[in-house]
């Protein structure tokens, strides 16, 4: 792999790491508030709707939308087991 490509990948990974830290902080805030049920497949549709609402607002909602997308990804993966 050439140096430019490696540099680009390193930059992307650094941004993902920073974003993941914000995601974790927000998930912690929500857990402290008492939010539960994220891993319950029965909540899939509700979480999907919430994600679409956060994504449509976009500005300032990126972390929440990403967390909801992560939860949907997890639920889908669990259903494939």
Sequence positions of predicted segments:
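Flexible "arm" and connector segments at domain edges
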Residues: 1-81
């Amino acid at each position: 792999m050439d140096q430019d490509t490696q540099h680009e990948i390193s930059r992307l990974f650094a941004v993902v790491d920073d974003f993941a830290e914000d995601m974790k902080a927000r998930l912690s805030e929500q857990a402290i508030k008492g939010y539960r049920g994220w891993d319950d497949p029965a909540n899939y549709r509700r979480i999907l709707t919430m994600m679409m609402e956060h994504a449509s607002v976009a500005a300032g909602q990126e972390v929440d939308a990403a967390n909801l997308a992560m939860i949907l990804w997890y639920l889908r993966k669990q259903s494939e087991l």
